[in-house]
Amino acid sequence: MESTEKLTDTNAILAYLYETFPLCFIAEGETKPLKIGLFQDLAERLADDSKVSKTQLRIALRRYTSSWRYLKCVKAGTHRIDLDGNSCGELEQEHVDHAQATLKESQEKAKAKRIAKAGKTSAPAANAKKPVKKPVARRPKAAPSAKPVKEKVAEVVLTPAVLTELKKNQRVNVKLGKAPVAGVILDIKKEDVQVQLDSGLTIKVKAEYILL
């Protein structure tokens, strides 16, 4: 019996999704916002496919929906689509605002990294020995006018939630990886809390992973 090799690389899984669901996952160009709860549909469609696991699918879907290309397509008046490319309703303004804020933050971080990298590269050249020049007499410059001090914005500190403080339809943040992800509580069963993320994913986590 021929065994099927399981895909583990996220890029390979995305390529597989592009090929399997071309009307939903767009490989190049402008993408379209995905249906809320699409992960469940995806898991059901690929339940008998031994190439991919639910965990790897979730990671690949998160990569797809957090890319700049995807976030740029989340704008007012746009409709979400299902696995077959069918329209599933217009985007809510709250989701549009969150996507644009996430995009802006991601682009600013990337810009800061580029500047920091450029600074490290130019530092050795700046420290190189320069020829000594004779001092040139200069006219005294007028004292520069004081620049207005920018007011620092207080950083929002998120703290772990207590299960008894949580309720349905409450806006929360879920600790996933390095940065918390915003979402809405759909249901609470015992110690498990079901949260619908703004990207469309629906996950189930313990209260300790929810931040307020």
From Swiss-Prot:
Q: Where is the composition biased (Basic residues)?
A: 130-141
Q: Which GO terms describe its molecular function?
A: RNA strand annealing activity; RNA strand-exchange activity
Any one cellular-component term (Gene Ontology): cytosol
Q: Where is the composition biased (Low complexity)?
A: 118-129
Keywords, sorted A to Z: Chaperone, Cytoplasm, RNA-binding
Q: Where is this region: Disordered?
A: 114-149
Where in the cell does this protein reside?
Answer: Cytoplasm
Which GO terms of type biological process are on file? post-transcriptional regulation of gene expression
Output the superkingdom of the source species.
Bacteria
PANTHER family per UniProt: RNA CHAPERONE PROQ (PTHR38106:SF1)
Job description of the protein: RNA chaperone with significant RNA binding, RNA strand exchange and RNA duplexing activities.
User: Which NCBIfam families does this chain map to?
Assistant: PRK04950.1
Which family would the database say this protein is a member of? Belongs to the ProQ family.
Please give the name of this protein.
Answer: RNA chaperone ProQ
